[in-house]
Amino acid sequence: MGKSEKRVATHGVRCFAKIKMFLLALTCAYVSKSLSGTYMNSMLTQIERQFGIPTSIVGLINGSFEIGNLLLIIFVSYFGTKLHRPIMIGVGCAVMGLGCFLISLPHFLMGQYEYETILPTSNVSSNSFFCVENRSQTLNPTQDPSECVKEMKSLMWIYVLVGNIIRGIGETPIMPLGISYIEDFAKSENSPLYIGILETGMTIGPLIGLLLASSCANIYVDIESVNTDDLTITPTDTRWVGAWWIGFLVCAGVNILTSFPFFFFPKTLPKEGLQENVDGTENAKEKKHRKKAKEEKRGITKDFFVFMKSLSCNPIYMLFILISVLQFNAFINSFTFMPKYLEQQYGKSTAEVVFLMGLYMLPPICLGYLIGGLIMKKFKVTVKKAAHLAFWLCLSEYLLSFLSYVMTCDNFPVAGLTTSYEGVQHQLYVENKVLADCNTRCNCSTNTWDPVCGDNGLAYMSACLAGCEKSVGTGTNMVFQNCSCIQSSGNSSAVLGLCNKGPDCANKLQYFLIIAIFGCFIYSLAGIPGYMVLLRCIKSEEKSLGVGLHAFCIRILAGIPAPIYFGALIDRTCLHWGTLKCGEPGACRMYDINSFRRLYLGLPAALRGASFVPAFFILRLTRTFQFPGDIESSKTDHAEMKLTLKESECTEVLRSKVTED
């Protein structure tokens, strides 16, 4: 009876002692971590507007995730294989959930969001925001500039920064320990497919994250305490802030839920393809595998500097790190600021932009990773062939990406900012051009951003600068009339918001996204072959440390600095800054889209172009380089084949004896 109960209990635990069960749990962890990461990137614009901070600070917040990751990556990669890897991954998922909760906390600690406007906050009629002659200017941002320093909410973005650091700390063990766990206990021929499934999970997470971000961006940030009918802004307005905090609460819950299964997995698994006896005892092959794994783990603590020297002297490994740093600099810059670029370039809201990104870009990425893994498994592609496959696929996608330079739109036509009051475009913003003969008598503020669109198709920075004298309606339906600067036949009225860019610009957005579909598919198709070059160019005992060192270099040389320097460069293309209560600049309201486009498309293209130089040298080195991964793979396959032959011989002997009896 006791043995029976023990066997049932053992079976209950042993259901987790399978590599495929671990793969399922790890895929869920990949989904949850990529979900929260994508949601964070999608909400950066909303966070920028909520706290009134420049893009360079937003870049610091984004890079803080990598700072947290950097704090533990070498420690985890070095000691991770000695410790209980599944439990460490589970703890990491729970810590990520804690970080997401901390990010959402400022919403509950600070007051309501107050967007920049010259319109009255109530329905009471007021002439203070109209064009009125012989009036002293009463639209100063505040009487006491020290209010900005005194206000607690002006530094609330630090909570987001710290929360993102904690999220980065939690994410640290998932990839290096998860990949090394699979590499240790999966068949070598199945490893590319399993990694392809993980990469697919990393595209499902962003898909869910972008859909969640799209939904939250359409909800006003203070939905629980503000009557949205009184708002004078819409989701397409650059002052609009969506309910960014809701999604982080969802991400916190998902990350904590995905942590539970990892606490039930054993420290080691039977090597895939090696069978256990029915009573749960290990066969000789499995004992040998476990003994070898233990020896490798003891060795990694003794020979840390030996392994570091070996990795540093591995030319393909070092060149691969250089390629990854350049490619990730380009990728992080492109992906982090893509919502901002599409909003400014094509005049779309954040909700529309992130929805289109999820709809057009992520399915081909998911498909590409899956097909790439299947190709590697089906045709048993060698490392040398994988290197060539990855190189030529990346090069073809790189050349295709240059078509994006054609899919461009002009700046929003804003009088005194991008065009003259007669509608003639000019390149540079000069402050005294904000005023014209039609509004100099109005004594308007030249700093406030509360744009209106005139019947003449030209936008103005405020109703006062448009020379408007009265209004009808309330909220977003407000219409301004008798606007002296609007010279259209028979009418001189304006409505709230910037003017639309027109159908031609919308068509170019569709073409841009179609190019992105093919580009994402081709690039992701090269992902698995490229990653297998990294895994197979290092010895098995160096694998965990090698993967961790690779991730460390990417984070310190790309993940942390890239969004910071790119954000600072984007700030230099700003045409008009928002104004805080103290009169200091807040978030940027409008960019010079031509300069922004050259920066957004040009810098990543230059970085990616440079990455093909070390990639070419890798192709040259593969001709003579002896890949440890291929040697170990062939040995494992040979051993498994011999084991299968012996099992077949034993089976035949038993059958013959049964026949004789």
Curated annotation (Swiss-Prot):
The modification Phosphoserine is found at S633, S634. It comes from the Eukaryota. GO terms for molecular function: bile acid transmembrane transporter activity; organic anion transmembrane transporter activity; sodium-independent organic anion transmembrane transporter activity; transmembrane transporter activity. Residues 432-487 form the Kazal-like domain. It is a multi-pass membrane protein. It holds the Pfam family OATP. Disulfide bonds join C438-C468, C444-C464, C453-C485. InterPro entries: Kazal_dom, Kazal_dom_sf, MFS_dom, MFS_trans_sf, OATP. Glycans are attached at N123, N134, N443, N482, N491. Gene3D superfamilies: MFS general substrate transporter like domains (1.20.1250.20). Residues 1-20, 81-86, 184-202, 267-310, 377-380, 536-544, 623-661 are cytoplasmic. Residues 41-59, 112-154, 224-241, 333-352, 405-512, 571-604 are extracellular. The keyword Membrane applies. SUPFAM superfamilies: Kazal-type serine protease inhibitors, MFS general substrate transporter. Optimum pH is 6.5 with estrone 3-sulfate, taurocholate, prostaglandin E2 and L-thyroxine (T4) as substrates. Belongs to the organo anion transporter (TC 2.A.60) family. A conserved histidine residue in the third TMD (His-107) may play an essential role in the pH sensitivity of SLCO1A4/OATP1A4-mediated substrate transport. This is Solute carrier organic anion transporter family member 1A4. The lineage of its organism: Eukaryota, Metazoa, Chordata, Craniata, Vertebrata. The gene is Slco1a4.
